[in-house]
UniProtKB/Swiss-Prot annotation:
CDD domains attached to this UniProt entry: LDLa, Tryp_SPc
Effect recorded for S441A: Loss of activity. No effect on HKU1-CoV viral entry
Protein name per Swiss-Prot or TrEMBL: Transmembrane protease serine 2
Biological function: Plasma membrane-anchored serine protease that cleaves at arginine residues. Participates in proteolytic cascades of relevance for the normal physiologic function of the prostate. Androgen-induced TMPRSS2 activates several substrates that include pro-hepatocyte growth factor/HGF, the protease activated receptor-2/F2RL1 or matriptase/ST14 leading to extracellular matrix disruption and metastasis of prostate cancer cells. In addition, activates trigeminal neurons and contribute to both spontaneous pain and mechanical allodynia. (Microbial infection) Facilitates human coronaviruses SARS-CoV and SARS-CoV-2 infections via two independent mechanisms, proteolytic cleavage of ACE2 receptor which promotes viral uptake, and cleavage of coronavirus spike glycoproteins which activates the glycoprotein for host cell entry. The cleavage of SARS-COV2 spike glycoprotein occurs between the S2 and S2' site. Upon SARS-CoV-2 infection, increases syncytia formation by accelerating the fusion process.
Length: 492
């Protein structure tokens, strides 16, 4: 976690670290012909450094001045022939630009379906919304029948999709009990032993509900529900599928400013991910079994789970040599991750043995649909990354306060010049001074809402550390929650 831009070291290689990877802890290797970003691992051992291409800004940061001379009349095209040619060229340029924009939009948004269709992830087939959650599988992978339940907003309102209305509706409290709550959480991908509690939220303003049919028999929870315009209790169900987003010392968080050492229990979801006893990346606990990290951390050869050990609840790296780590059983990288652009930079790790939760080890909440992020929203980053550019991994866990930066501003030519996709979030300060850095990759970007901490980003990339107009870039977890739940369901 960098407090400011460090100076280049007096000796050794100096290079722009665009992915926040840690320094290579292995001894120097025989001299080879260098390439700018290539990492040469020690013989017989996998490199603990995530290997990937750096982000390169495509334009200079200074404005480009057009020096084309104009005619005395103030226009370039004077004759009829020239005017016709200019119009043709202008129209052609516009059409080409529109086609490129459409192609980029399709690429980054990742769906080929129109507004009237929903895409099957397994095949790319477009399904009519009326066929989604109708009790019949239309997608080859069956995802149209297992993505019918969700939690909405910061109050965890339980919603179920209605194929009749082609929209999501809250579940009426009438006849509801804990058993149904556990079943709904299980449908999302949580295990029964994760279940926390259910609540009731006054939602008398709603005019459309999903109500329980108690005589429906032993079927999936969404098949027990039917659409109704009335709810006798005038209350809807709120579910906590796991006790998440709670930390210690919440009243003392203002003391952790600008990258200071973290307090015990302040960031209990933070894990240190090691390869061969060396910290490589960070991660965030979302259940006793699942860790969220960055896809660039687990590029080959580090996609093999046996390389990885996770440490939770320990603030100092030196103490991890004496503590028991948790071996990783499975590594799942997002299938659409692009190692060049860092688009869809998210991955999951499943642990061989579940974590035991306590005051120092707790999960962070995944964001729910309906949660809106605001420009300059207060967030926090944490990790064992370097405290200055080109520095070494920190001994202690650090945390720092950052602000969200709106995508339009972050995509300006003076910042990242259209490198930011909908699957990314910018956070930090345009003046620099506070940022993620080498070794922070995969770690959390969190924000507090309703006294609950939410994971809204995973540390992805940047241009150097804490440089002006080069804020940190994070994977947009709000885009990936459906994918995360799908992996949890498939492995449940």
């Amino acid at each position: 976690m960098a407090l400011n831009s460090g100076s280049p070291p007096a000796i050794g290689p100096y290079y722009e670290n665009h992915g926040y990877q840690p320094e290579n802890p292995y001894p120097a290797q025989p001299t080879v012909v260098p390439t700018v970003y290539e990492v040469h691992p020690a013989q017989y051992y996998p490199s603990p450094v995530p290997q990937y291409a750096p982000r390169v800004l495509t334009q200079a940061s200074n404005p480009v001045v057009c020096t084309q001379p104009k005619s005395p009349s103030g226009t370039v095209c004077t004759s009829k022939t020239k005017k016709a040619l200019c119009i043709t060229l202008t129209l052609g340029t516009f059409l080409v630009g529109a086609a490129l924009a459409a192609g980029l939009l399709w690429k980054f948004m990742g769906s080929k379906c129109s507004n009237s269709g929903i895409e099957c992830d397994s095949s790319g087939t477009c399904i009519n919304p009326s066929n989604w959650c109708d009790g019949v599988s239309h997608c080859p992978g069956g995802e149209d029948e297992n993505r019918c339940v969700r939690l909405y907003g910061p109050n965890f309102i339980l919603q179920v999709y209605s194929s009749q209305r082609k929209s999501w509706h809250p579940v009426c409290q009438d006849d509801w009990n804990e058993n149904y709550g556990r079943a709904a959480c299980r449908d999302m991908g949580y295990k029964n032993n994760f279940y926390s509690s259910q609540g009731i939220v006054d939602d008398s303003g709603s005019t459309s509900f999903m109500k329980l049919n108690t005589s429906a028999g032993n079927v999936d929870i969404y098949k027990k529900l039917y659409h109704s315009d009335a709810c006798s209790s005038k209350a809807v169900v709120s579910l906590r599928c796991i006790a998440c987003g709670v930390n210690l010392n919440s009243s003392r968080q203002s003391r952790i400013v600008g990258g200071e050492s973290a307090l015990p229990g302040a960031w209990p979801w933070q894990v240190s991910l090691h390869v061969q006893n060396v910290h490589v990346c960070g991660g965030s606990i979302i259940t006793p079994e699942w860790i969220v990290t960055a896809a660039h951390c687990v590029e080959k050869p580090l996609n093999n789970p046996w390389h990885w050990t996770a440490f939770a609840g320990i603030l100092r790296q030196s103490f991890m040599f004496y503590g028991a780590g948790y071996q990783v059983e499975k590594v799942i990288s997002h299938p659409n991750y692009d190692s060049k652009t860092k688009n869809n930079d998210i991955a999951l790790m499943k642990l061989q043995k579940p974590l035991t939760f306590n005051d120092l080890v707790k999960p962070v909440c995944l964001p729910n649909p309906g949660m809106m992020l605001q420009p300059e929203q207060l967030c926090w980053i944490s990790g064992w990354g370097a405290t200055e550019e080109k520095g070494k991994t920190s001994e202690v866990l650090n945390a720092a306060k950052v602000l969200l930066i709106e995508t339009q501003r972050c995509n300006s030519r003076y910042v990242y010049d259209n490198l930011i996709t909908p699957a990314m979030i910018c956070a930090g300060f345009l003046q620099g001074n506070v940022d993620s850095c080498q070794g922070d990759s995969g770690g959390p970007l969190v924000t507090s809402k309703n006294n609950i901490w939410w994971l809204i980003g995973d540390t992805s990339w940047g241009s150097g550390c804490a440089k002006a107009y080069r804020p940190g870039v994070y994977g947009n977890v709000m885009v990936f929650t459906d994918w995360i739940y799908r992996q949890m369901r498939a492995d449940g």
